[in-house]
């Protein structure tokens, strides 16, 4: 199975401009993401998908591969779709979408979503990762997306709010979403062509579009947490984690 991992990266960010190039222990964040991904088994190719020449130069500077996408891409999925069209992938090729703000992603987490497609061919169109929240401050933080899933590990909903809500107890597991997706090229093209979903627009979560239009998302539960970098403070958290790893 051909497996291409794409890391969408854009320079402009309202909360943290230039985030992909923010230094973490002397290396740009995008390099940490790329190097972590390259340790995962089963990948055919890795590319950074960007529309910014500064990011392109940084990636090529450490020996990485880049595909330049349109600056008109309205979303991360549109950027991924643009990239796979340029790369000429086949309909059944597997695409891994690793968010560019995951500098501490564990390579085995990437292998987990690949394994789902290998073990359950044709049973679902999309797969992603979850992790049981340990840090209680994340429970009500809208930057940490929560998720619920059924007994067969198919996603029921994703939300920036705490889900599920325990009416009579607070002693229950809550899972957060980790920014890794897997899907076939054919599904990415179909997904990108769908109109914006109502719930997607409310929560600002693209994966809800898949659920709103009846597509199944398989969930793997990771044993490893990851830090999503949204602010400069998150950079310091990454450096602290790396210091003890």
UniProtKB/Swiss-Prot annotation:
The question of whether Signal is a record keyword is answered with no
Q: List the disulfide bonds.
A: none
Its biological purpose: Activates KDO8N (a required 8-carbon sugar) for incorporation into bacterial lipopolysaccharide in the Shewanella genus.
- Coiled coil ranges (UniProt) are none
UniProt pathway annotation: Bacterial outer membrane biogenesis; lipopolysaccharide biosynthesis
What sort of enzyme, by top EC class, is this? transferase
The protein's matches in PANTHER family, at most eight in alphabetical order, are given as: 3-DEOXY-MANNO-OCTULOSONATE CYTIDYLYLTRANSFERASE, 3-DEOXY-MANNO-OCTULOSONATE CYTIDYLYLTRANSFERASE, MITOCHONDRIAL
Organism listed in the record: Shewanella baltica (strain OS185)
* Catalysis performed (reactions): 8-amino-3,8-dideoxy-alpha-D-manno-octulosonate + CTP = CMP-8-amino-3,8-dideoxy-alpha-D-manno-oct-2-ulosonate + diphosphate
| EC code | 2.7.7.90
Which UniProt key words apply to this protein? Cytoplasm, Lipopolysaccharide biosynthesis, Nucleotidyltransferase, Transferase
Q: What is the name listed in the Swiss-Prot or TrEMBL entry for this protein?
A: 8-amino-3,8-dideoxy-manno-octulosonate cytidylyltransferase
Alphabetical list of Pfam families matching this protein: CTP_transf_3
Chief location of this protein? cytoplasm
Query: A biological process (GO) annotation for this entry?
Result: lipopolysaccharide biosynthetic process
Family note: Belongs to the KdsB family.
Tell me where in or outside the cell this protein is found: Cytoplasm
Q: Which GO terms describe its cellular component?
A: cytosol
In alphabetical order, the GO MF annotations are: 3-deoxy-manno-octulosonate cytidylyltransferase activity
